[in-house]
């Protein structure tokens, strides 16, 4: 198969050093003035470059390309001016919307938005954003911190007060109830001291000395009560106050069914009758004395009788205890005293 269109090429010469020199190479490429590339005697590429007869023509075309429409230039300048104005902080100090203080400063743009400048008030220590809602939270959340501190202080103060109250209660209350001792006195609180009873003779009472058995253990014998004339009859020799239930005060009261001022058989006799009564002894000698009581017929039922042992025989004979239990001198017109 033969291709007639394929051109045959001659092999390059064997002399390589000579072929390296373009001057010696018969097929070297040359660039002519008209812009055509020739190789040896054969023209390989023919291209005619445009010639520039006017050298100022290139500068005119560059100036025309850089020329901008005045309308578009004005729009871009306005946009750049607006952005520059928004990016700059507001001039002057703005008044705080809360306290109207001028001691404010510009901080930054909220969320990097140029339309939301954020300011800080040094007076009330709060931020505010132009166009945003006002927040009452100060810098660092001071309100919340103060609330926690106050609640903690109140709790600690209440706990300390509770501890102090409990300590005071423990200090005042006795540790053991067995250590509490009742301070008992041998004499009753409603009775005067018995040592000065003999000195009452100057006012007309003429009370004899009473030899009471005052024990140091807080027990009072029944003779002490008999000496005072409170009880008549019955065996009350046991202690009045003590741990023995059989000899306590209630037992002594039960055994003594009546007082010395009233007779046991008082309601069994008529008023004109005379009753001989045996009175209890007084003191250590236990001297028994009998007194005859004359009971007169009286509508009021007044009873006059001497108190045995409390009136000396040598003193006035008209002293007695009235029915009301009050000492006084009798009137000779109404009552008479007879001593056996």
Curated annotation (Swiss-Prot):
Single GO MF descriptor: DNA-binding transcription factor activity
Compositional bias (Polar residues): 166-180, 309-331
Keyword terms of this UniProt record: DNA-binding, Metal-binding, Nucleus, Transcription, Transcription regulation, Zinc, Zinc-finger
Superkingdom classification of source: Eukaryota
GO biological process: regulation of DNA-templated transcription
Function of the protein: Transcription factor that binds specifically to a 5'-AA[AG]G-3' consensus core sequence.
Biased composition, class Low complexity, residue ranges: 151-165
Zinc finger map (Dof-type): 94-148
Pfam families according to UniProt: Zn_ribbon_Dof
PANTHER family according to UniProt: DOF ZINC FINGER PROTEIN DOF1.4-RELATED (PTHR31992), DOF ZINC FINGER PROTEIN DOF2.2 (PTHR31992:SF107)
GO CC annotations, alphabetized: nucleus
Subcellular location: Nucleus
Annotated stretches, region: Disordered: 12-33, 138-180, 301-340
Binding site for Zn(2+): 96, 99, 121, 124
Protein name in the entry: Dof zinc finger protein DOF2.2
